[in-house]
Amino acid sequence: MSKILIRAMVLPMTGPEDFYPEGEIGIENDRILFVGEKGSAPDSFIPDQIIDLPEDVVMPGLINTHTHAAMTMLRSYADDLPLMPWLQTKIWPFEDKMSDEDIYWGTLLALGEMIQSGTTTMLDMYASMDQVAKAVLEAGTRGVLSRGLIGNAPNGERAFAENIDLVKNYHGAGQGRIQVMFGPHAPYTCSGEFLQRVKQEADRLGVGIHIHVAETEDEIKTIKEQYGKTPVQWLEELGLFGGHVVAAHCVHLTEEDQEIMAQNKVFIAHNPESNMKLNSGTAPIPELRSRGVVVGLGTDGTSSNNNLDMFGEMRSAAFQQKLVKGATALPAYEVLQMATVDGARTLGLHDVGVLAPGYKADLISINFDQPHFYPRFSIPAHLVYVAHAGDVRTVMVDGKILMQERQLMTIDIKRVCREVEKRAKGIAQGL
């Protein structure tokens, strides 16, 4: 039994008015026992460790609802291109040369970057997902993993079988830190018959589906030419939306598409920086939220972003909508919800995303004793419009400290950086 008492400014994300300037959090093993003002600890709570962070804001760990972690291997390899030329001429040829070991090291680099920027949970889609699971288990983070499935590719059936094995071997692994979904890539890379088989297996195994949807105007045009419908309408017709589905991007949605998403309770992973960099467009996030659609926030991969800083992603999410929809669009607290509690809902995780009794002890501290955080009129505004990855001081998952005073505790990051540099350059030289 391990008991920890944290003293800090506490933003629990349980409501817009909930903030404890002199707060306390009590943790026993992997769970939160209490959260409140100074003096909240019951007399019976005798901590084994006290962590005093009087100038830090402690909040739930950030949740990245859509990424391709091992694409750290491709960071800065292919820039300044639209989506399809980027994929077809640069990304896919590079990925074809990546080994299982490359994916392991690339994922470990991503996890180190995520921890250092306050992300405790990710939804990942890639290949060699057993290697991704290995990296997640070693790093101590939380991960929802999906094997990327390009149904139209020669290895489509093998990848499908790998996703089934991933569920059987890793769903619930690491004391529940790993969950698994199916990962059909997109409507334009999977046939209707393939998608229906994916849906059938997901239902049989009791897991969700993670898919790119309506990312570009070219995708809309392609699907309309093939099926006479928008991607969202076609996926609904196929029956894909019957269970827990996370749809990434969702940039180009008609009013009917948005209503379909709401009626089917589809969860959306919003990736504003990737959408801007690839010139994909601006997703109708305020409209979707007003219909009751739950929207999480994601970075996408590092070759279309090019980092995994969820603080930067929050700022971009807010600024992009304000530019297009008006200054009142997506207030700071709503963006924080997308990166925490709504991110957890998007991934189907019911015991993370807020700091409250009974929830997992997944939390981060941000060092507010810095010039850019003064004066402190609004903590949520500072977190969204000011904070960046380098402000994160402490990271905890399942009650275990993964970073303290910015020092990673579970990853030898210098070794990982050297290994990724060597491997990535070797692949690029062979192309």
Curated annotation (Swiss-Prot):
Enzyme Commission (EC) number: 3.5.4.28, 3.5.4.31
Residues binding Zn(2+) are 66, 68, 212, 300
> Iron as a keyword?
no
Short name of any one Pfam family annotated for the protein: Amidohydro_1
For this protein, what is any one GO molecular function term? 5'-methylthioadenosine deaminase activity
Lineage: superkingdom: Bacteria
Q: Which reaction does it catalyse?
A: S-adenosyl-L-homocysteine + H2O + H(+) = S-inosyl-L-homocysteine + NH4(+); S-methyl-5'-thioadenosine + H2O + H(+) = S-methyl-5'-thioinosine + NH4(+)
Residues the entry annotates as binding substrate: 95, 147, 185, 215, 300
Q: Which residues form the signal peptide?
A: none
InterPro entries cross-referenced by the UniProt entry? Amidohydro-rel, Deaminase_MtaD/DadD, Metal-dep_hydrolase_composite, Metal_Hydrolase, MTA/SAH_deaminase
The cofactor note reads: Binds 1 zinc ion per subunit.
Q: Does the keyword Hydrolase apply?
A: yes
Q: Which cofactor does it need?
A: Zn(2+)
* Alphabetic keyword roster: Hydrolase, Metal-binding, Zinc
Which family does this protein fall into? Answer: Belongs to the metallo-dependent hydrolases superfamily. MTA/SAH deaminase family.
What functional role does this protein have?
Catalyzes the deamination of 5-methylthioadenosine and S-adenosyl-L-homocysteine into 5-methylthioinosine and S-inosyl-L-homocysteine, respectively. Is also able to deaminate adenosine.
PANTHER family xref list: AMIDOHYDROLASE-RELATED DOMAIN-CONTAINING PROTEIN (PTHR43794:SF11), AMINOHYDROLASE SSNA-RELATED (PTHR43794)
> What is the name attached to this protein's record?
5-methylthioadenosine/S-adenosylhomocysteine deaminase
Identify the gene encoding this protein.
Answer: mtaD
